[in-house]
Swiss-Prot record:
Coiled-coil features, chain-numbered ranges: 87-136
GO CC terms, sorted: synaptonemal complex
UniProt keyword annotations, A-Z: Chromosome, Coiled coil, Meiosis, Metal-binding, Transferase, Ubl conjugation, Zinc, Zinc-finger
Region listing for Disordered, in residue ranges: 152-179, 198-269
Name of the encoding gene: Rnf212b
Comp. bias (Polar residues): 206-234
UniProt pathway annotation: Protein modification; protein ubiquitination
Organism per entry: Mus musculus
GO biological process: chiasma assembly; homologous chromosome pairing at meiosis; protein ubiquitination
Protein's recorded name: E3 ubiquitin-protein ligase RNF212B
EC number of this enzyme: 2.3.2.27
Length: 297
């Protein structure tokens, strides 16, 4: 220690030195018991030896050594604190990672639920519209049942209806088939055509044919003229006595439906006006036909 010396005589060598409470060092020769020789203050003194306490020895050690010891202690303290800090940071990092994963999962779930909610709202709106429509007109829900086509029973083509004489000078023999496009029919007319007492017996099989039967209350005698072709031609008939004597009704069957048109009698080929007959002539002709029928049988 280069700095160690007596503050009174400035000696460096010697075996006994004393230090006062006021911070002065004296050798054994310069030491006074009551007052400090330098500052003159009352003080206590302590003999320097190897038995000093640690807090007293540190004042006589080298500052570099003291600094190294302090730095070593500081380094240990710093390493310990840094280790604890690293553990705490690692814990927070792991917790942040878990929280980020939980937040991401929650965001995905929220997006999925929002999409599902939008779909449910859309479906709910459509169902509300349908419900409003059904509340407004409940018959539309069952309307399709009213328009359902019903099956029609049709007899076999082999079955036929036998001809029978009619009280109004007309009879019909109808042979039905399973399709409207293959219905043959025979019309036996008892009308009086061209001043003769002949019965007109017509049989034709158009693609879509049908027969008209005069009502019992009618006084018409119908004469049917089938066309030569199987389809697309008209079947005309005309009344002989009363009613619509000025026109001839032309019935034209086809595959798609029935058409009915009216033409003037003069436009038809071979048109002849009906001949009015008296009740006596009609009766005589009816008896003649009846006799002819019996003979033919």
């Amino acid at each position: 220690m280069d700095w160690f010396h007596c503050n009174q005589c400035f000696r460096k060598d010697g075996a006994h030195f004393f230090v006062t409470s006021c911070g002065h060092i004296f050798c054994k020769k310069c030491m006074t018991l009551e007052k400090c020789a330098v500052c003159g203050n009352l003080c206590k003194h302590l003999a320097l030896s190897d038995n000093l306490k640690p807090q007293e020895k540190k004042f006589f050690k080298s500052p570099v050594e003291t600094a190294l010891q302090c730095f070593s202690h500081i380094s240990q303290v710093w390493c310990f604190q840094k280790k604890q800090t690293d553990l705490l940071i690692a814990f927070y990092k792991d917790r942040i990672t878990k929280l980020e994963a939980a937040v991401k999962e929650a965001q995905e779930m929220a997006a999925s639920q929002n999409k599902e909610l939008s779909a449910l709202r859309k479906e709910n709106g459509e169902l509300k519209k349908i419900l409003d429509i059904l509340k407004g007109s409940p018959s539309c829900y069952y309307g399709s049942r009213l328009t359902t086509p019903r099956p029609v029973g049709i007899t076999s083509p082999s079955q036929s209806v036998a001809p029978r004489p009619s009280s109004h000078h007309s009879s019909q023999v109808v042979s039905r088939s399973s399709s409207m496009e293959s219905i043959p029919y025979t019309v036996a007319g008892m009308g009086h055509v061209e001043q003769g007492s002949r019965g007109l017996h017509v049989r034709s099989t158009p693609g879509d044919s049908y027969t008209e039967t005069p009502s019992p209350a009618s006084t018409h005698s119908l004469s049917y003229r089938p066309s030569s072709a199987s389809s697309g031609q008209g079947v005309s008939f005309r009344p002989f006595f009363s009613g619509d004597s000025g026109h001839t009704r032309v019935l034209t069957p086809n595959n798609s439906g029935r058409r009915e048109s009216r033409t003037t009698p003069e436009s038809l080929p071979g048109f002849q006006l009906p001949v009015l007959q008296t009740f006596y002539q009609q009766r005589q002709m009816g008896l003649a036909r009846k006799d002819g029928w019996n003979i033919s049988r």
